[in-house]
């Protein structure tokens, strides 16, 4: 787990966008599982990104017309995973971050911290080999933030690589 800290506007989120294949670098390479994302066309880059990278967006990026469960299911559906396995994995991810009971709620009916947990569950679902987390504890209280950092650490310890962007030194120490 690599933690990145810096002042606002210093390029931390841009780094994650490039590392995650959301943006192409102006020069250089970005390798994920031995594949240079920068060398791929946008369709192939999106395919590799979907299968390999779990991204936790700073602004949650939840789809308002989908329930919490449906938001978490989406990456696996796009990967062609069977519907029964999609539902099981999404519910497990929601439980892992402590919001399984909110599965049928829509984002507008969730608090900021609950939205953040749903976004984290979506980033973790499917056992991605790379986890990119942009301020994953920003909307959480101290206790909830510690719980989420433990969840992220468990995924890293299980073999995922991760980049954490944070303003909090105590979170970077994880």
Where do the model's predicted regions map?
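ABC family nucleotide-binding domain
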Residues: 1-174
């Amino acid at each position: 787990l690599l933690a990145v800290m810096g002042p606002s506007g210093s390029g931390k989120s841009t780094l994650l966008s490039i590392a995650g294949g959301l943006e192409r670098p102006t020069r250089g390479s970005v390798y994920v599982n031995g594949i240079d994302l920068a060398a791929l066309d946008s369709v192939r880059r999106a395919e590799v990104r979907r299968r390999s990278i779990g991204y936790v967006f700073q602004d949650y990026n939840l789809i308002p017309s989908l329930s919490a469960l449906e938001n978490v299911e989406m990456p696996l559906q796009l990967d062609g995973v069977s519907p029964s396995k999609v539902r099981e994995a999404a519910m497990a991810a929601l439980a892992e971050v402590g919001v399984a009971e909110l599965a049928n709620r829509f984002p507008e009916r969730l608090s900021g911290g609950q939205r953040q947990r749903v976004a984290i569950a979506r980033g973790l679902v499917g056992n991605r080999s790379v986890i990119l987390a942009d301020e994953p504890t920003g909307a959480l209280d101290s206790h909830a933030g510690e719980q989420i950092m433990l969840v992220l650490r468990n995924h890293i310890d299980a073999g995922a690589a991760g980049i954490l962007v944070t303003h909090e030194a105590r979170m970077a120490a994880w």
